A protein has these predicted regions:
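C-terminal motif of bacterial Sec signal peptides marking the signal peptidase cleavage site
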Residues: 16-18
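A short beta-strand motif characteristic of beta-propeller blades
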Residues: 20-26, 70-78, 111-118, 154-165, ...
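A short loop-to-beta-strand structural motif that recurs across blades of beta-propeller domains
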Residues: 53-64, 101-103, 144-147, 195-198, ...
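Short loop/turn segments that connect beta-strands within beta-propeller blades
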Residues: 66-70, 106-111, 149-154, 200-205, ...
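Asp-box/WD-like beta-propeller blade repeats and closely related beta-sheet repeat scaffolds
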Residues: 101-102, 107-131, 161
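Blade-level signature of beta-propeller repeat domains, shared across WD40, Kelch, NHL, RCC1
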Residues: 263-301
Length: 301
């Protein structure tokens, strides 16, 4: 009897529950863009308004806080947010990326304390990242990441806002040790071959290199719990999230929803993965079961 061994590499980072088992947050959401972990819960930025608009001209934006199964509005519309995007927290202060500005709130009472505007007047500020006393801000339409000194969050020197590094259509920023991963997303404004995922190697003397070469509109970066993989959204693959193995650079995609969606942001918290759907005003919650390595499956005929 002839026997053959078939070795199958399973490129699966995680197994998620079927669509019928998934939990979905919908309460008090209206076009949720980004999530930020805070005090055991999740701050969520919402565009508000009648339709998805990255550059709202009315202050329809608001922030909710999800914890213990409840999602409550903590910064209502009308408080100076138009299309609030990425967020970052330092101490008790929340920094919010918005249309041509960064807005600062004191989380003790959720009061607005400052607003740092970009001088050009039309900056698409997409995401923020805190590292020590520095705040990194991505601006997709300028092909730039900026740096702001936030040593004293109540007394920020607005003139400290400086260009940091140039790279194509920067959107989501994610810190990994002494490196920053940057997704590229033109938000439908340009079709460019260099819309990929980059890594900034040396933060003191920034240089960039690609870690994914496939053209796409990338958004929402997260790490697997053991930091061996990068999980991401590619908005050119509707309803799917991707995962990349750092060890060998291979990646694959996992379907999250059959709905026409715009998956925009990812957050891993307490063994669950939260996935923002900007278009449908939903956040999917998935249980996460992870494999550390590829699984070898041997079949004998």
């Amino acid at each position: 009897m002839a026997k053959s061994n078939i070795f199958v590499l399973v490129l699966v980072t995680f197994i998620v529950a079927s669509c019928s088992d998934k939990t979905v947050i919908t309460s008090n959401l209206l076009h949720p863009y980004a999530m930020c972990e805070y005090d055991g819960g999740i701050l969520i930025s919402n565009f508000g308004g009648d339709a998805v608009d990255y550059n709202n001209t009315k202050a329809t934006g608001f922030i909710t806080y999800y914890k213990n199964g409840s999602n409550q509005v903590v910064i209502p519309a009308g408080n100076g947010l138009y299309s609030p995007k990425g967020m970052a927290v330092k101490e008790s202060f929340l920094f919010v990326a918005d249309v041509n500005k960064i807005v600062v709130f004191d989380l003790d009472g959720y009061k607005k304390v400052d607003e740092i505007e970009f001088p050009q007047g039309d900056a698409f500020v997409g995401d923020l990242l805190v590292m020590g006393n520095a705040l990194f801000a991505s601006v997709a339409n300028y092909d730039r990441i900026y740096l702001l000194d936030i040593t004293a969050p109540r007394q920020i020197d607005h003139t400290s806002l400086l260009e940091y590094v140039e790279l194509p259509c920067p959107s989501t920023l994610k810190l990994m040790g002494e490196y920053i991963l940057v997704s590229s997303n033109s938000f439908g404004k340009a079709d460019r071959e260099d819309k990929i995922i980059h890594i900034i190697d040396d933060l003191g003397n920034p240089s960039i290199r690609p870690i994914i070469h496939e053209h796409g509109d990338y958004q929402g970066l997260a790490f697997s719990p053991n930091k061996t993989r990068l999980i991401f959204c590619n908005q050119e693959r509707n309803g799917y999230i991707g995962n990349l193995v750092f060890e060998n650079g291979e990646y694959s995609y996992e379907q999250v929803t059959d709905d026409k969606s715009l998956l925009n942001s990812l957050l891993l918290l307490d063994g669950k993965m939260y996935i923002c759907d900007l278009l449908n005003s939903k956040i999917y919650i998935k249980e996460l079961i992870e494999f550390d390595n590829f699984s070898g499956i041997i079949k004998t005929d």
